[in-house]
Swiss-Prot record:
It comes from Mirounga leonina. Keywords: Acetylation, Apoptosis, Electron transport, Heme, Iron, Metal-binding, Mitochondrion, Phosphoprotein, Respiratory chain, Transport. GO terms for molecular function: electron transfer activity; heme binding; metal ion binding. GO terms for biological process: apoptotic process. Electron carrier protein. The oxidized form of the cytochrome c heme group can accept an electron from the heme group of the cytochrome c1 subunit of cytochrome reductase. Cytochrome c then transfers this electron to the cytochrome oxidase complex, the final protein carrier in the mitochondrial electron-transport chain. SUPFAM superfamilies: Cytochrome c (SSF46626). The gene is CYCS. The modification N-acetylglycine is found at residue 2. The keyword Calcium does not apply. Belongs to the cytochrome c family. The modification N6-acetyllysine is found at residues 73, 100. It holds the Pfam family Cytochrom_C. This is Cytochrome c. Heme c binds at residues 15, 18-19, 81. InterPro entries: Cyt_c-like_dom, Cyt_c-like_dom_sf, Cyt_c_1A/1B.
């Protein structure tokens, strides 16, 4: 498990421009991530996803996020997420640790 505080910094630097995490947070360029863990791809209510995201059919968890966040366009070809990814495993683990707490129902 990663470091939550480091993960929060990574979120602010690399994710917060397009995503919110709090319950009832608005969608930006990307969807609000509240309730992310255990949800299938392309399922945040009220967000317009590509067919690629809707049809991927995986459930978000530590393992799927670890793979996705390394290279989003490789993991879901056709996603509109323009983020290049986080190459360092430790940074991805930190971000996931933060997301696990910040997006919890």
């Amino acid at each position: 498990m990663g470091d939550v505080e480091k993960g929060k910094k990574i979120f602010v630097q690399k994710c917060a421009q397009c995503h919110t995490v709090e319950k009832g947070g608005k969608h930006k360029t990307g969807p609000n991530l509240h309730g992310l863990f255990g949800r299938k791809t392309g399922q945040a209510p009220g967000f317009s996803y590509t067919d690629a995201n809707k049809n991927k059919g995986i459930t978000w968890g530590e393992e799927t996020l670890m793979e996705y966040l390394e290279n989003p366009k490789k993991y879901i070809p056709g996603t509109k997420m323009i983020f290049a990814g986080i190459k360092k495993t430790g940074e991805r683990a930190d971000l996931i640790a933060y997301l696990k707490i910040a997006t919890k129902e």
